[in-house]
Amino acid sequence: MRICTWNINSVRIRLDQVMRLLSEHQPDILCLQEIKVANELFPENLGEELGYHHRLIHGQKAYHGVAILSRLPFVKAEPRYWCGKEDSRHAWASVKGSDGKPVELHNFYVPAGGDVPDPEAN
């Protein structure tokens, strides 16, 4: 299983680069961080023509946000929240590995700082 991850810093301004990465490297799964777009504005067909039919988008307007694009069907997938915040920083998905056993995938965006200098609060 080939997995790529990319802190993209705004998916909508890098659509051509995403398509080039998917075409040239052909990962089974692509994890994106800092997509900086609300779920409903995520590029609807991104990667579809290359077989990336399974997706979990956990975005928010202007900052943060993570996405998982996959050729492999999800057994289960859901957004997660941390530290009592509604920031879109974590997406979790499970896919079947080549041996048929589930593989858990956690896509995190972890900013360098936070509102207060406390790891438990951020």
Report each predicted region and the residues it spans.
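N-terminal, active-site-proximal structural segment of metallo-dependent hydrolase catalytic domains
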Residues: 1-50, 63-66
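Short, intrinsically disordered, charge-balanced linker/junction segments flanking boundaries
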Residues: 118-122
